[in-house]
Amino acid sequence: MLKHSENSMMTAVMDYAVIVARLYEKALTLGSLTLNTADEYVMRYESDYCFIDQYYRLANETYFGIDPTCELFDAVQKVKRCLDQNYSKLCNRINMEWTRCLKETGGIGEVHLLRQQNFYDERIKPIQKKVAVIVSDALRYEVAKELIGELARSKHIASLKPAIAMLPSETKYCKPSLLPHRELKLYGKGEEQDMAVDDHILDTTLKRSEHLQVYRDGAVCVPFETVAEYNLEKNREIFKHPLVYIFHDVIDKTGHDGNAKQIVNSCRDASTELKKMIPKIHASYNVTEVYITSDHGFLFNDIMFTDKDKHKIEEDCLERSTRYYLTKSKDEVNGVVKFPLNEVSGMVNVSDVMVAVPMGTNRFAAPSGGYMFTHGGAALQELIIPVITSRQERDDNKQPVGVMILDRRLSMQASRLRFKMLQTEAVSMDMKERPIRVALYHNDVPVTPVKDILLDKTDPSLDNRKIQVDLTLNKNIDAKVLQLKVFDATDELNPIIKENVTNNTLIENDFDF
């Protein structure tokens, strides 16, 4: 039997096993994957499907932290190979049904979400006070879901809503559409296409700033790195502007050329950077509203794609990639779904152009390559993008999370008490973290070291909010009953928990010849 705390590598193996088990547990409770409407798929993606993606990413992140010299590594590799295949098959099945539903029920127009190209008009334009927008390239919805849990520990209030990206779910089309515009147009450049915003290609930060200022006087666009590297004084100059668009590129920049380890680590890096930056923008630069969104999501599978796994494109096309191609052909193609580009993109000069995407999560054979990490298609993971709204508000009304002892009979053995506590609520936008102090007492004097514990878990699962506590006597005590006391760290006069503990150490000593 492995002890979780004895060996860091064994700990990593056990953590990996737990995450894999959670993924399979979630997968087994999904029920039928055949739903009636596109909106139902979006709701299921928010509530269930996105956690499959999250657990797969976290499983990979944990796997790459396991030392290959670990004695259980061969067994872990076998589990991973099975997981990679099973996850790939499940994602494909979900998205086969999703794309079938889109095809049969009227396309993306039947999805009742904020359309990406309307983001500025519907979310930013009505705001008259100072606002910042962070556009994080390839920030997938499930990564944002994890981020919102981290932001719950901050004093500001944040909420997460889904929106739907344009097709193709590609940076050069989706990112500029988040800026204000009168019209979007497809702009041909040989065998590649681009998108003009009000007849301009906005492919640099300077061009985006100049364009933004046409719609809001004094607005500015800056790279995330600039804000991260600047000192307080320089950043205060940036955030004097009424509207600041910040472009953040960690996941996409790493993903296209990275290996599996680099891809999952880039998600962690992006989340960490955003988690630090958002409260800083609120607190240091007096910006009351910050929006965080993405140009698109991505598909990620740590498997080899052979030629037989790649769908060959046999039609004439304007542009092609691993997850889409643009064509003027309206002919039906086996394994491919086509949408009128003007209905799924917001572009106005493309009435004769179709965007073709593979059913499910299949990949097209394309000279651009990039199969492990890819986007451009119509999978839920690519199209459903996050819109996080963070507002600077006082958290005086937030209640601290609760705590309870799970063990019914507390007894001390060999001078040690081991028991489990439960953080009764998850830290959220309604509940704040709680620092507590725990010790054993006799006559109101601590007889073990006082243990400081921060109840800050954001996981909705009760099992993942359990905490094991060990207390060891540091004084000779002849009392048969001691008291376990738990205090809120801000009030050490009134315990929130007080339980009797049988001192079996004394009984053992009575028979110690």
Name each model-derived stretch.
Residues 1-513:
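Feature captures the catalytic ectodomains and active-site-proximal regions of enzymes
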